């Protein structure tokens, strides 16, 4: 019986992963259609920046504010000091302080461009959500790294997709964008990156 349960769980995880990947590709295509040939677009949605590259890039340094970064298509690498990170569309990463990073796009082409998003995180919103949700206290020693990587779940991706889809309904952005961003932050707080995000509010 235990084997059957394990097989069922693995099958469900595989179905969820396949669904997320297909949905990501569809969302990446919509973003490419909206932003055209621009490599970086500060969108009409507050705090949201979209990225698109048609070819790999050289390492480039810049300052990243407290944010969550998600790749919808492609592969990128980030360096901070002696630490290197490589992540793709199955994961996201979070920073809680301003960080001087070196970023490089590793996989991108005209037919399958690199597509990603950066959502700046708001300190006051996080603090209020921590109070409202009554999340358990942090364990000491957690969230010690400057960058935390997390697995992208179906509910979290669903919220991200709803946020980006608001670009097609600009009249809805002022009302719905704050609500969807609040959901995204709440779902991030309940992931393995929750301790890192809580640091923003302290």
Model-derived segments and spans:
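A short, N-terminal "cap"/entry segment at the start of jelly-roll beta-barrel domains
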Residues: 1-44, 48-51, 57-58, 140-147
């Amino acid at each position: 019986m235990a084997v059957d349960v394990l097989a069922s769980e693995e099958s469900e995880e595989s179905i969820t992963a396949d669904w997320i990947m297909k949905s990501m590709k569809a969302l990446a295509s919509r973003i490419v259609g909206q932003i055209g040939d621009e490599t970086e677009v500060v969108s009409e949605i507050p705090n949201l920046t979209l990225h698109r590259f048609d070819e790999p890039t050289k390492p480039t340094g810049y300052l990243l504010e407290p944010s969550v970064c998600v790749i919808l298509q492609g592969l990128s690498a980030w360096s901070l000091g002696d630490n290197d990170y490589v992540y793709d569309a199955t994961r996201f990463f979070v920073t809680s302080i301003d960080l001087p990073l070196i970023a490089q796009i590793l996989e991108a082409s005209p037919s399958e461009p690199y597509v990603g998003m950066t959502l700046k995180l708001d300190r006051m919103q996080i603090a209020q959500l921590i109070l409202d949700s009554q999340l358990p206290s942090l364990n000491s020693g957690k969230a010690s790294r400057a960058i935390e990587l997390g697995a992208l779940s179906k509910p979290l991706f669903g919220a991200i997709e709803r946020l980006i889809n608001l670009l097609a309904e600009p009249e809805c952005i002022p009302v719905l964008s704050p609500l969807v961003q609040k959901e995204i932050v709440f779902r991030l707080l309940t992931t393995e990156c929750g301790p890192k995000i809580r640091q923003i509010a302290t």
